[in-house]
């Protein structure tokens, strides 16, 4: 395809309607037709990236292969498309302004007054088109964060308006809105959608396709009414009804020919409808599964639905791969202790100790780990979860009562987890951790090696602290083996206790490398061990 096509996904009425899922689903449909597709997210906040944002504020922080801390929607894009993203796939207002200000300081604007239009909008447009020009994608789908009408989003909306004018048929806008159902009146209300589209039109954009989020199926009369009042073709009004799983959304859109409508509007040949066989097989396995596997997730942000999004989805994918339904139980680590851990965790087939930062809730993780170790419950520790495995083992097996991480207690006698050498002179918090994909060599015969089926793997990281190798011999002599390490630095990446059924801690984040068609092998192995433990 000669020219890259650009599709913008905007949202109206309320936030959290699922623009990211719609963008990912549309991308999946186009990819299934043989097109090379990528998806990017523009976030209107002024932070450079979400790396320093509290999970309560923003949910999970996702990490790309090239080490960018990104919005959790990039996780959806990767899980749906099975294609890695980079820092170019997530742009914030902060990065746009930072780039423009740096150019102004260097004199790139030759003394011009730097303004939102054209300088900020030009920088936004440059970032929109970068992926298409650099990587030769057929389609670049751009999700605009926030809701139409938000003051923060205005420069992005203006940039979309300009691009629609400049790119002509190679550009279109998909607008997602909400159609509420008023139970007392027993009717749907389309007025919020009409006003949302009107707002978009006032900003110079006529949407080409409308996606209506709704809890119940809408009648043809309602969709025709929306088409009439919003200046949209009747076949370009698509419903996105609530479904049991987000992975059904591509099929919901496909049944309404959303991909066909978009291809026709862009002057492209439609061709036969793709089967999407692997996707359908995944959903069929999910539907057919009758037995369940109970996994307990121990973390300190469990009350927020999106805080461990990639872990949740990785567990689901691994459970389906093993022909099981996932029964996920969330345990707040601040509410766990040695006195209640056995009672609260006794029904779990497996335990996952979540990543995180800081002292709060860490004693509850130690209690869960001690229970799992003493009762031989399959257990996976990720990042801080792995570090907690090391600390608990040092305290309760090696007799180092004061063992700790220098993150929690800088003056601890036994620094079994310590700040990485290259982190000791770092002063800025943002974007300064060990980030992105790194190599790891696994010890043959280890649980991790058996899971991956190979010696050399690559997984993504997000941490400042590491296992202190000064204690390695003591741990190995006492039964906790270091079975994975970075080939260049010797940094310990994997620890496990071979005497137990399945007890593995990893410094990396395997959840960032798990998709619908390729679930992460470590999660698959962990869930299999939990099933065998029933």
Language-model region placement:
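Flexible phosphate-sensing "switch/lid" loops adjacent to ATP/NTP-binding sites
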Residues: 1-327, 334-350, 357-358, 365-371, ...
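Active-site proximal loops enriched in glycine and acidic residues that flank catalytic Cys/His/Asp
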Residues: 11, 41, 214, 241, ...
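Cysteine-nucleophile active-site neighborhood
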Residues: 17-20, 24-28, 32, 344-439, ...
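Short beta-alpha connecting loops at secondary-structure transitions
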Residues: 57-65, 243-247, 353, 374-382, ...
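Short, hydrophobic alpha-helical segments
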Residues: 230, 262-270, 397-401, 526-534
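Acidic/polar loop patches that form or flank catalytic/metal-binding clefts of enzymes
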Residues: 271-274, 380-381, 400-406, 449, ...
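C-terminal and late-domain segments of enzyme folds
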Residues: 435, 439, 443-534
